[in-house]
Amino acid sequence: MVSIAFYGGIPGGISTPITQQSEKSKCEENTMFQPYCYNNDSKNSMAESKEARDQEMNLKEESKEEKRRNDWWKIGMFLLCLAGTTGGILWWYEGLPQQHYIGLVAIGGRLNGSGQSNAIECWGSFPGCRPFQNYFSYETNRSMHMDNNTATLLEAYHREITFIYKSSCTDSDHCQEYQCKKVNLNSSDSSNSVRVEDVTNTAEYWGFKWLECNQTENFKTILVPENEMVNINDTDTWIPKGCNETWARVKRCPIDILYGIHPIRLCVQPPFFLVQEKGIADTSRIGNCGPTIFLGVLEDNKGVVRGDYTACNVRRLNINRKDYTGIYQVPIFYTCTFTNITSCNNEPIISVIMYETNQVQYLLCNNNNSNNYNCVVQSFGVIGQAHLELPRPNKRIRNQSFNQYNCSINNKTELETWKLVKTSGVTPLPISSEANTGLIRHKRDFGISAIVAAIVAATAIAASATMSYVALTEVNKIMEVQNHTFEVENSTLNGMDLIERQIKILYAMILQTHADVQLLKERQQVEETFNLIGCIERTHVFCHTGHPWNMSWGHLNESTQWDDWVSKMEDLNQEILTTLHGARNNLAQSMITFNTPDSIAQFGKDLWSHIGNWIPGLGASIIKYIVMFLLIYLLLTSSPKILRALWKVTSGAGSSGSRYLKKKFHHKHASREDTWDQAQHNIHLAGVTGGSGDKYYKQKYSRNDWNGESEEYNRRPKSWVKSIEAFGESYISEKTKGEISQPGAAINEHKNGSGGNNPHQGSLDLEIRSEGGNIYDCCIKAQEGTLAIPCCGFPLWLFWGLVIIVGRIAGYGLRGLAVIIRICIRGLNLIFEIIRKMLDYIGRALNPGTSHVSMPQYV
């Protein structure tokens, strides 16, 4: 510790150093020449009053500064809690199933039947279908106008299913004619050998009658149940069942579309709808989708297997047959046990689908009204308008599974009851979004959540007003664009209807042209006949011939039908041009509306786009609004502190350390100063130096003289210093002399060591070196948290700021939870108190202290 000496004078006019004595010094005989004499105990007691005042002033300043900081935190935390509460409410609202959700699905105007069956599409997760699962339906009693040209769901089913199998499978020629003969399969009970015999009267084997069919072109012979083939004109020519009713013939299909477990739906989009007429009180079911359809379910012989215990075992048989050329396809026999099986059409022969992973077989079973069934692997089947050559795997199915569905699936009768209608207008329709309807709500960038979040943010921070304006502007703009888009869609659909009418007229005109060509051919034949019979001098009406007139020679019928068709075609052309022109105008207006620049809205939109890029993966959820609000809040609340800290950091480590050391020195030496001692010393200096004490006093307490140096003393000549030392030594004892310090020499020594710099840098270097380090200790102090303004720990300061924010949020949350619990406890106590008082009141009423009721007495 550096000793500090005060220099003054004695009444004799000789200056003597007034020293601060150590703790062991006693008041000796030389104390009469000193202005005061005391030890540490008396010093502490005398400086107590000033220390208390300093502490009180420091506490007041710290409380004011803390209050200012708390004000920032209170405002910020209030806004943060407001945003969190708003976000929680919006999150809860978005997750609720709304009973009446106003969607973009719309029905308005008149419902007319439409023949545009290509508006019906396949929806589902299967490849080739639209990956969309939203559907709705409800009952209505609206009147609908349908005609014979109204498309049904059955037509679309045949088209879509056939397209799926036609595009997924390989073309086949299995629908050619077969030369078949009836055979019997005879087997002995003792062996697994079966003989194939040609007979006229066939008998059943394994529950079926059998045919041996030969396809000469492919050198292929198949042994097949009679139920799978159809005879042609009571001859030996047979074809697979269903070939005449289908136009697509395929084989080797992917297993995925043969399991019978993959669902799809045939759906439409507004302004088209599907209607199923129930015929009960003129009500109909209207929706955007028809019933669920499973891929792989056959048209005929549908059977449903239910129950846990189902087992099928292969019966291995050796088929003994005559010599043959090419391929001989033998049947695969099964014995199955079905505990619960249903025939959909009450047919004696049923078809079920047995499958495992990557393998499937269609079993044709004989329904014998018992749990034991004889089955054979089916060779052919019909799905939609596709005729399939069903797979026949060589490996038997071990892990057997059976498809389970309702008999109404893929039912032709039910699909034919669903008809396609089209509305002429678009109006909002309340649709239930509960789980039983299957309507799934999609989050939207600019919806109720966006508007509410923008309004809340606008009340919290001024920057969010721009976003709210953008949200409202974009909502109106999008609504206008949607209206124009609906008009474009309606006009386009109307134009397509008109084009369809034109196509029908063109088809009729083509038929008429074909008829005219036939008439010309007939006329040519007549001409040739006239030439043969020698008809001469003929006109277009009369012919002079010797042969009688024959009515079969032909007639030329005049008709005005062609002129009517031409007139209708011209009218339709005009309507199509008008409709398409209106659609083009609406589309242009939609693009103009959507691309109309708005300076404020465009700025906000760009800002929103940048924020969306900064926060990837959040999408259009409510988290985007909350994160945006938190970022803006942190930016506004932390930017002043960040800028202030940056300014202090860039101002240099010297000034930061200097302020830190000043504050530390002030707190360290405040308790050692004494008001009474200082006053006595000032009086002594005033009497000895003739007024120079005031100057010394000002210098001591000046801003640049805080470390105990005296510039007045430094400016005096060194001889004056020596004279003071010489005269002072004669008035102090040896003990006190040993404790006299030389502050000037110490200070000069440090000044010389500082390289001629100003005294402030020297004192800074002195203080840091006395603490045992250099300028890099500032960084250590910053990391330890002992430095108020860190010089190199700015990232650490930011991290601790984030930790403090999280801690304060958690603290406010816990305090809020405590308040809620306290309110709940008070409420429960109030309820219990009310119940107690009511019970007490009732009890007192029923059992009063003094009874005024006199009981009757019987004498």
UniProtKB/Swiss-Prot annotation:
Gene Ontology terms for molecular function: structural molecule activity
CDD domains: HIV-1-like_HR1-HR2 (cd09909)
UniProt region (Immunosuppression), positions on chain: 498-513
Region (Fusion peptide): 446-466
Residues annotated as site: Cleavage: 444-445, 684-685
Post-translational modification summary for this protein: Specific enzymatic cleavages in vivo yield mature proteins. Envelope glycoproteins are synthesized as an inactive precursor that is N-glycosylated and processed likely by host cell furin or by a furin-like protease in the Golgi to yield the mature SU and TM proteins. The cleavage site between SU and TM requires the minimal sequence [KR]-X-[KR]-R.
Free-text function comment from the UniProt entry: The surface protein (SU) attaches the virus to the host cell by binding to its receptor. This interaction triggers the refolding of the transmembrane protein (TM) and is thought to activate its fusogenic potential by unmasking its fusion peptide. Fusion occurs at the host cell plasma membrane.
Protein name: Envelope glycoprotein
Organism: Equine infectious anemia virus (isolate 1369)
